[in-house]
């Protein structure tokens, strides 16, 4: 199938998602203050996209579920390491916002993740034969898990570093309080 036909048959929501991811990546290049829950948007998008691939392609396959979960864990670990290599965000006590340092990392990750998912789904659409389709479906599901984990691991590590820079322990309660915009009773 020619490339132009593939592009023409791509649903509009896919291009809207790509535009959104590029927009968010470009916005992340400049330092900015954002509410913690807004930082969760892109990881949530990739988790939903990855989980939908799992649901669409699993056919009850334990292999696909294992591929998704295994890749999710590997991605989360890699995302945590990646977040450790960049400057830590700072928490503004007055506003409760996160001061995110500018970086091209989000734009690059968004584009690479989109390209990998897009290419995998195009390859699936073009694959004939049940065995080849099942094998490729496992790869596409794993890619979805890998990038969902990468974004979640990076985000959670950024939250942890912001709390630590603010002199707080990064407990589950402190992370939840950060996202909803209030301090836990032990921190007040």
What is each of the regions a protein language model found here?
Residues 40-60:
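A generic, lipid-embedded transmembrane alpha helix
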Residues 108-188:
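C-terminal membrane-adjacent module
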Residues 33-46, 64-71, 95-99:
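Cytoplasmic-side transmembrane-helix entry/capping segments in multi-pass membrane proteins
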Residues 19-34, 80-93, 154-161:
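C-terminal ends of transmembrane helices
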Residues 1-6, 24-34, 71-72:
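Short juxtamembrane and helix-loop transition motifs at transmembrane-helix boundaries
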Residues 12, 38-43, 80-83, 103-116:
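Select subsegments of transmembrane alpha-helices in polytopic membrane proteins
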Residues 4-18, 65-74:
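Structural signature of hydrophobic alpha-helical transmembrane segments
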Residues 61-77, 139-146:
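Alpha-helical transmembrane segments
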């Amino acid at each position: 199938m020619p490339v132009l036909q593939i592009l023409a048959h791509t649903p509009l929501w896919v291009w809207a998602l790509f535009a959104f991811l590029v927009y968010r990546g470009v916005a992340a290049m400049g330092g900015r203050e954002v509410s913690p829950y807004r930082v969760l948007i892109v990881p949530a998008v990739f988790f939903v996209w990855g989980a939908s691939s799992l649901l669409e392609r699993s056919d009850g396959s334990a292999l696909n579920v294992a591929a998704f979960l295994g890749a999710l864990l590997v991605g989360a670990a890699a995302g945590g390491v990646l977040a450790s290599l960049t400057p830590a965000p700072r928490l503004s006590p007055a506003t409760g916002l996160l001061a995110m340092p500018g970086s091209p990392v989000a734009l690059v990750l968004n584009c690479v993740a989109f390209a990998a998912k897009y290419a995998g789904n195009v390859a699936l659409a073009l694959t004939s034969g049940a065995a080849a389709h099942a094998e490729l479906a496992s790869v596409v599901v794993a890619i979805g898990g890998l990038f969902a984990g990468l974004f979640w691991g990076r985000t959670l590590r950024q939250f942890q570093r912001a709390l630590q820079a603010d002199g707080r322990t990064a407990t589950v309660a402190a992370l939840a309080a950060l996202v909803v915009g209030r301090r836990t009773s032990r921190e007040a």
